[in-house]
């Protein structure tokens, strides 16, 4: 029996699919439900000179992410306990959230396209996370 379900979303058009699937599970188990989005920290990826104010860009992205998470949470008929946003290594951020919020099921999506076969973030997460995972296949049309 699950007590707290965490849905990892990328805030794409597939995010509601994942959340609705998790809502069904949460209702059956009377579990808490939370969502998380992990942003890539752009300043960590580029080491050369750039001609933009990185902190103002990250602030804008963070504000947009929070609004998107709120909109997503309001799109379902189930209370969302936590709306989390993090940046950095996907596996580490998810591990930290799982530990901090006592999560026992992680729901994530997996694109079934050429690039995902080569570089899957889901595979990295599966090797990091120590709780049950539901990996929902997302087909690219």
From Swiss-Prot:
The keyword Cytoplasm applies. GO terms for cellular component: cytoplasm. InterPro entries: Rossmann-like_a/b/a_fold, Universal_stress_UspA, UspA. SUPFAM superfamilies: Adenine nucleotide alpha hydrolases-like. The keyword Metal-binding does not apply. Gene3D superfamilies: HUPs. Coiled coil: none annotated. Keywords: Cytoplasm. GO terms for biological process: response to stress. It is found in: Cytoplasm. Signal peptide: none annotated. It holds the Pfam family Usp. Homodimer. Required for resistance to DNA-damaging agents. Unlike MJ0577, UspA shows no evidence of ATP binding activity. Belongs to the universal stress protein A family. This is Universal stress protein A homolog. It comes from Haemophilus influenzae (strain ATCC 51907 / DSM 11121 / KW20 / Rd). The gene is uspA.
